[in-house]
C-alpha cells in the first residue's frame, strides 16, 4: 500500500472538533474513495503537507498505521512533492494516535553518516562497518532521530557504531537516494 496514489474524501477537516471523541483534528482526515481494494481494512486517512482545509485530496500513501487494539489500518497521505519521515508523521498524528498503541510503516527513510578516514604513513585508510542484517559493508550511518539535524545524526552514528569522535570537512556533503526492495524510498546523506 505504501507509495500508492489514493483519493481521500475529507470527513473531518483540520481544526474541526469531534464532540463524541472529544478530539480536535490537527490534520484533514477522511475516507479513502479510490486507489485501494474495496475490501481493504483501511478505516481512514490523515492528510499531511496541506495547511488548509480541503474537501477532497489526491496524494501518495506515505505511511500505514495499524492500531494494536483494533482491526483495520489508517493511512497517512501527502502530496507527491512532500517527504515526511517516521518521527514527523508520529508528531503529526499524535492528536489522534497515542504513542505506543500502534505500529507504523513508512515509505520514506532518512539516514546520515560519515566517511571516516585517517592517514597513516602517507596511506589513506577508511573505516567500514559490516551491516548486521546483510552481507554488505559501508560507512557508519543511521536514521535521523527526533530533534536531530543531519550532522548531529552523522556524529552520533559514528560514535555509536565505531566509538570515534569525528570532525567534519567543510563543504563536503553527498546525498544518495535509492529504493529498498521497491518498497521503501531511502535518502542517505554522507559527510
Question: Model-derived features: where do they sit?
Answer:
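Hydrophobic N-terminal alpha-helices or hydrophobic patches in metabolic proteins across all domains
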Residues: 1-107
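Short histidine-centered catalytic/ligand-binding loop motif
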Residues: 75-80, 140-147
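N-terminal strand-loop-strand
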Residues: 105-139
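A contiguous binding-surface segment within folded domains or other stable secondary-structure elements
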Residues: 134, 145, 163
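Hydrophobic alpha-helical positions that pack around
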Residues: 140, 154, 158
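N-terminal phosphate-binding loop and adjacent alpha-helix
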Residues: 148-153
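Active-site segment of metal-dependent pyrophosphate-handling enzymes
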Residues: 159, 163-191
